[in-house]
Regions:
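An N-terminal hydrophobic leader/cap segment in hydrolases
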Residues: 6-69
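Acidic catalytic loop of the alpha/beta-hydrolase fold
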Residues: 253-258, 285-286
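Catalytic active-site module of serine/aspartate enzymes centered on a nucleophile-bearing elbow/loop
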Residues: 290-307
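Short beta-strand/loop motif that positions the catalytic acidic residue
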Residues: 242-244, 249-251, 255
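Short alpha-helix in the alpha/beta-hydrolase fold that links the catalytic acid
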Residues: 236, 245, 259-268
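Alpha/beta-hydrolase active-site loop
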Residues: 134-155
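Hydrolase active-site cap/lid region
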Residues: 174-230
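Conserved alpha/beta-hydrolase
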Residues: 108-130
Length: 307
C-alpha cells in the first residue's frame, strides 16, 4: 500500500511538473494587453520617442475586422487595412506574447506608403484569436496558410508578401518550406529564432537560470501531452532549405532575446534565397525604430524586386 502511495505521489509530482512547464512556455495569460505595455528596459526606453507615436498612428488607421477558422477549429481574428483594389497584399504576423501594433508599427506604414494592402493577423492565443497553446510556429504555420487561402479567395491571386517579427518571423520562415501558391512573391523575417527548441533552451538557461537538461524535456513533453504538438516537428533553419521564395532576413546585433547568431545560422542555411541584413545597435523586434531610414530602404529595395 505504501509503495502505491509513493508511486502515486511521484506520478502526481511528474504530471505537475509537466503542466507547470506547459503553462510556462505555451500559455499566455494576458492576450488583450495594451500595445503600450511593452517591456520597460534600457533598450526600449531609447526608442520610445519613435515607437509610441508610430503605435498611435497605427491604432488610429481605419480597418475592417476579419476572421477565419483554423484547421483545428479555432476562430482566428485580424484586421484588414485597405489601400486600393487589386493592390499587392502583405500578411503581417506578430511575435510570441507580442502585440501586432508594436511589432508592425513601422512595417505597416512602409507597406501603406508603398501601396500595399495589409492583413494584420492575431496569432492563436493572442488578441481576439482563440486557442490555449502557443506552439512557436509549429501550428501557427498552418494558420498562416489558412490566411493565405482566405486572402486568395477574397482578393484573387494578387501578389502577396508574408512579413513576420520574432515568433511571427519564425512562423513565416516555416511557411516558406511549405507548398505555397505562386502569388506569394517574398517573405520578410525580422529577428527570427532558428528553432523552437533552441530559443526555449536559451531562455531557460541564459535568461531564467534554470537547468536546461532537466527542464527542457519536461517542457517539450508538456507540449506534446497538453498541447498536442511536437516542438521538433519543424524549424526555420530547416524550412528555408526547402524554400524557393525570396527571403529578406533582418536582425539587430544587440538582440538580447533572440541572439543575432540565430539569424546568421538561418541565413547560412539557404544563402541562395536569403538576403541578410544587420541593424547596428537594435534590440529585439526594434529594428525599424532603431534605424527607420535604413530599415525602410532595405525593405523597399527587396519588395520592389519581388513585386
Amino acid at each position: 500500500m505504501l509503495m502505491l502511495i509513493l508511486l502515486a505521489a511521484v506520478l502526481a509530482a511528474f504530471l505537475y511538473a509537466l503542466h507547470f512547464g506547459y503553462k510556462l512556455a505555451f500559455q499566455y495569460e494576458d492576450p488583450l494587453a495594451s500595445p503600450y505595455n511593452y517591456p520597460d528596459t534600457d533598450q526600449t526606453r531609447k526608442v520610445k520617442p519613435v515607437l509610441d507615436p508610430a503605435i498611435a498612428a497605427f491604432l488610429e488607421a481605419p480597418y475592417e475586422d476579419v476572421s477565419i477558422t483554423s484547421h483545428d477549429g479555432l476562430k482566428l481574428t485580424g484586421r484588414y487595412y485597405h489601400v486600393s483594389d487589386g493592390a499587392p497584399l502583405e500578411i503581417q504576423c506578430h511575435g510570441y506574447k507580442g502585440n501586432p501594433f508594436v511589432d508592425f508599427a513601422g512595417a505597416w506604414r512602409i507597406a501603406k506608403n508603398a501601396g500595399r494592402n495589409v492583413l494584420l493577423i492575431n496569432q492563436r492565443c493572442h488578441g481576439g484569436s482563440e486557442g490555449h497553446t502557443i506552439t512557436f510556429g509549429i501550428l501557427e504555420k498552418q494558420d498562416v496558410m489558412a490566411w493565405i487561402t482566405y486572402a486568395n479567395n477574397r482578393f484573387g491571386q494578387v501578389p502577396m508578401l508574408l512579413n513576420g517579427v520574432s515568433m511571427g518571423a519564425a512562423t513565416v520562415l516555416m511557411v516558406s518550406g511549405m507548398e505555397l501558391p505562386d502569388n506569394v512573391k517574398g517573405i520578410i523575417a525580422d529577428c527570427p529564432y532558428d528553432a523552437p527548441s533552441n530559443i526555449i533552451k536559451k531562455v531557460l538557461g541564459q535568461d531564467m537560470g534554470m537547468p536546461v537538461k532537466l527542464v527542457y524535456p519536461l517542457i517539450r513533453l508538456g507540449g506534446m501531452l497538453y498541447g498536442k504538438f511536437n516542438l521538433n516537428a519543424d524549424s526555420p533553419v530547416e524550412a528555408v532549405k526547402r524554400s524557393n521564395v525570396p527571403i529578406l532576413l533582418i536582425h539587430g546585433d544587440d538582440d538580447r532575446f533572440v541572439p543575432h547568431p540565430m539569424g546568421c545560422s538561418i541565413a547560412a542555411a539557404a544563402p541562395e534565397t536569403i538576403e541578410f541584413h544587420t541593424i547596428a545597435g537594435a534590440a529585439h523586434a526594434m529594428n525599424y525604430v532603431t534605424d527607420p531610414e535604413s530599415y525602410r530602404a532595405i525593405v523597399t529595395a527587396f519588395t520592389e524586386r519581388c513585386l
